[in-house]
């Protein structure tokens, strides 16, 4: 049995978890509501203030989905209570970020500013002009929005200029040595 999958997920106060007969899990909390459909090869039950995930059989796919399903539901519960956030930093001369209403405007060395629309349920905060914080209840969407922002100008291999996650180590290549 999966070591992760067999652990029950405690439901904190103020969080409501519902499981429909077709394996759709709905988690409601202070930070919003999340809903996700899971495959029928796993059984999801709410009992004694905990969510318990079990599997029907023991083949490879069912074993894989057992731990995955438990981890996703645990992230849904954490998301509606605490939320998730991902921080990015902009490195480079003249590179900056600004917020205009619900749009993030990035000036990162292109001939034009790049505009990114804020998605519903995801909050984008600009601190100073070189730090961006993406917040939300859905871990997957927070990570995807942060990855989309980073993709606008990935860190350069020679100077490290671009958009990177806070704490990300960018390995720099050595430049040409040239003739002397």
Curated annotation (Swiss-Prot):
The keyword ATP-binding does not apply. GO terms for biological process: cytoplasmic translation. GO terms for molecular function: rRNA binding; structural constituent of ribosome. Part of the 50S ribosomal subunit. The gene is rplF. SUPFAM superfamilies: Ribosomal protein L6. This protein binds to the 23S rRNA, and is important in its secondary structure. It is located near the subunit interface in the base of the L7/L12 stalk, and near the tRNA binding site of the peptidyltransferase center. This is Large ribosomal subunit protein uL6. Keywords: Ribonucleoprotein, Ribosomal protein, RNA-binding, rRNA-binding. One of its GO terms (cellular component) is cytosolic large ribosomal subunit. Belongs to the universal ribosomal protein uL6 family.
């Amino acid at each position: 049995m999966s070591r992760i999958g067999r652990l029950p997920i405690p439901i904190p106060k103020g969080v409501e978890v519902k499981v429909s007969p077709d394996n759709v899990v709905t988690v409601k909390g202070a930070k919003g509501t999340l809903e996700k459909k899971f495959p029928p090869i796993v059984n999801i039950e709410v009992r004694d203030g905990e969510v318990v995930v079990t599997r029907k059989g023991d083949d490879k796919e069912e074993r894989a989905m057992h731990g995955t399903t438990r981890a996703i539901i645990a992230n849904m519960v954490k998301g509606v209570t605490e939320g998730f956030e991902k921080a990015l930093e902009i490195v480079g001369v003249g590179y900056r970020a600004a917020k205009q209403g619900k749009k993030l405007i990035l000036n990162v060395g292109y001939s034009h500013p790049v505009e990114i629309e804020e998605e519903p349920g995801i909050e984008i905060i600009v601190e100073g002009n070189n730090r961006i914080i993406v917040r939300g209840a859905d871990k997957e969407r927070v990570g995807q929005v942060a990855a989309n922002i980073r993709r606008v100008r990935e860190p350069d291999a020679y100077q490290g200029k671009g958009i990177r996650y806070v704490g990300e180590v960018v390995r720099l290549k050595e430049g040409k040595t040239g003739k002397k």
